[in-house]
Amino acid sequence: MREVPQVLGIVLAGGEGKRLYPLTADRAKPAVPFGGAYRLVDFVLSNLVNARYLRICVLTQYKSHSLDRHISQNWRLSGLAGEYITPVPAQQRFGPHWYTGSADAIYQSLNLIYDEDPDYLVVFGADHVYRMDPEQMLRFHIGSGAGATVAGIRVPRSDATAFGCIDADDSGRIRRFTEKPLKPPGTPDDPDKTFVSMGNYIFTTKVLVDAIRADADDDHSYHDMGGDILPRLVDGGMAAVYDFSQNEVPGATDWDRAYWRDVGTLDAFYDAHMDLVSLRPVFNLYNKRWPIRGESENLAPAKFVNGGSVQESVVGAGSIISAASVRNSVLSSNVVVDNGAIVEGSVIMPGARVGRGAVIRHAILDKNVVVGPGEMVGVDPERDREHFAISAGGVVVVGKGVWI
């Protein structure tokens, strides 16, 4: 083993995100805008770069143009120092087919691993909102002697049925891993909590390569990291769980320590935005010691004119609020809210315009939506249901580029 372990980051960014439709109608899930200045992929990339993991392959597939462009424009590193973040589309190296699962994505990209020859592989998902120092997880992985380490977060057992659940012993060795079980296991120290997988893994390179190659030869496999690779390694006694609550991110507050959100549904996506807007936010975007990097557009500052009022909200650069009221909302860049309009409890994505006297409540407006003067969204449920998507929790979602 080399004195300084060599690490290659692999970001699994091929997710289709069907449950986020219509936000994923024209883009991959990791490319969905979030938080006024970011895309979902920016959180994992920021965590890796902040930890000085600067060789990163982002495996893409589904409607990846905007994701590829975002990475190319906003995540350029110094190639002279061997540093890179590069999007890698499906290579079709073993036949004329796309990735059949997350494990197959790595299998089709094994040449990247062979070329870099890393000691460890940091394999993280691309569609969660969180801060994490992966270097601490790597130290745990090396110290545990495991071939695979899974980042786990504790959730109430009643909420765990939607996740991959981890049954571990007192030492952290995983005894069983089950996708979405009806009866989730408790943790060794709290029977009312369950460790669920965050979709973040660290592998000793040979262990993962051997497992990936064996999985590729298994005609009965779905070629999924959580559903196939991890159970294979658990059965071999090679997997451990890393307790995310032990991860200490510089600059974290008591309010947002160990914050992690799976934003795979419209309601979860909306709720995670509402976590940003209070005086003491549940997730703090303003941590300068562990920054989240996002869009690098050269935009003018936001402007509030003619008595425009903004309370408990995040407003992106280039936005103009003119004699309008914005409360408990997240507005992305270049949003215009005209005279007399009201925006409450809503998420407005880049380039949207809310016309004079319009009302937007409990809604998500995708990029470049135009709401005409006096129009209402989130006010009349029956009318909204006829024209827009509505989440299980009642959030009205207007797709990209719609004129109302």
Curated annotation (Swiss-Prot):
CDD domains in the record: ADP_Glucose_PP, LbH_G1P_AT_C
Residues where alpha-D-glucose 1-phosphate binds: 99, 164, 179-180, 197
Organism: Mycobacterium leprae (strain TN)
InterPro entries, alphabetized: ADP-Glc_PPase, ADP_Glu_pyroP_CS, GlgC_bac, GlmU/GlgC-like_hexapep, NTP_transferase_dom, Nucleotide-diphossugar_trans, Trimer_LpxA-like_sf
Function, as annotated: Involved in the biosynthesis of ADP-glucose, a building block, required in the biosynthesis of maltose-1-phosphate (M1P) and in the elongation reactions to produce linear alpha-1,4-glucans. Catalyzes the reaction between ATP and alpha-D-glucose 1-phosphate (G1P) to produce pyrophosphate and ADP-Glc.
Molecular function via GO: ATP binding; glucose-1-phosphate adenylyltransferase activity
Keywords attached to this entry: ATP-binding, Carbohydrate metabolism, Glycogen biosynthesis, Glycogen metabolism, Nucleotide-binding, Nucleotidyltransferase, Transferase
Cross-referenced NCBIfam families: glgC, PRK00725.1, PRK00844.1
Protein name stated in the entry: Glucose-1-phosphate adenylyltransferase
Highest taxon in the source lineage: Bacteria
Pathway: Capsule biogenesis; capsule polysaccharide biosynthesis; Glycan biosynthesis; glycogen biosynthesis
Family membership: Belongs to the bacterial/plant glucose-1-phosphate adenylyltransferase family.
EC number: 2.7.7.27
GO biological process: capsule polysaccharide biosynthetic process; glycogen biosynthetic process
Reactions mediated catalytically: alpha-D-glucose 1-phosphate + ATP + H(+) = ADP-alpha-D-glucose + diphosphate
Gene3D superfamilies noted in UniProt: Hexapeptide repeat proteins, Spore Coat Polysaccharide Biosynthesis Protein SpsA, Chain A
SUPFAM superfamilies in alphabetical order: Nucleotide-diphospho-sugar transferases, Trimeric LpxA-like enzymes
